Amino acid sequence: IRKPSHSGLVAIAVAAALSGVAHAADKPARAPATIGDLKPRAVEIRKEQKVEGSAARAIDNYRRYLEQKDADPELRAEALRRLGDLNLEVGEGERIEKEVSAIDRSGAEAIELYTSLLKAYPDYPRNDQVLYQLARAYETTGQPEKALATLDQIAERYPGLVQRDEVDFRRGEILFSNKRYAEAEKAYKRALDAGANGAFYSQSLYKHGWSLFKQGQNEDSLPSFARVLDANLTDRSNGDKLRPIERMSRADRELVEDTLRVMSITFSYLDGATSVDQFVAKRGVPPYSYLLYSRLGDLFVEKQRYQDAADVYRAFVARDPADENAPILAMQAIEAYRKG
């Protein structure tokens, strides 16, 4: 009996692996963004662990399998997809090590594999995921316009995609970075359709508010920013009480602090204390009302607008003199008068 060659063994092993999971529901990683400082920045995808030698061996095996001219078409499509995914993973792992040439090489190969798959197998049932990964590969290799075009294609062809909220959020991020704020606003709004339980809900609200702010629609941006605070500061399980900022994760804390900051700036552009009073009344006096007054007053102190600062602090005391924070703001009002 003839023993199969090494390449034959590889083909058998790879085919077995592919046939067992050809239709498994792989799901791309969805990491929330980290928003820091006042200036909004794009979402940061959590760094992958560096790919070790086992991945390199898998890449080699898939390449050998694809060399087999009699490979099953369905399994060949699956092998192309998996090889593309592995190359993309390798490139992202190298990015952690700042090996730019390796990123370009692995990312370029992933792009070539995905585009070949889409061309050769237009009816492959997992082309939605192939396009999703292709967009990631374009982003990894610094080609945002091609990434955007691919994400647009996904949005048009696969409206029911599980990762649709992430697709729209990423579209928004690219559009926002290109200063196409009106289009970014629509993309973030579409991402919000996933609901409050969506992985990109708070980030989409935040950037939706920023998109309006960047278009000069300052007052219109406030409801989106307030919904960020509603989602992060209102403790629904504890009688809608204020959730302590200091107990939040770093990412959530930065998101909340930046939201409070941009809202303070917006109120300062409007009518100061009067604007906060009207906004809080319209929102039904949310549990974080104290923070809106406090942060606006602090901003006015930074700008040496001491009379305005005192007016804001006093406005909160007048609105809710029995609040536990009222004495604190009353003292801050006195201090602002003293400085002015």
Per-region residue spans from a language model:
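Bacterial N-terminal signal peptides that target proteins for export
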Residues: 1-10
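Acidic, polar-rich low-complexity tracts and alpha-helical solenoid repeat scaffolds
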Residues: 21-340
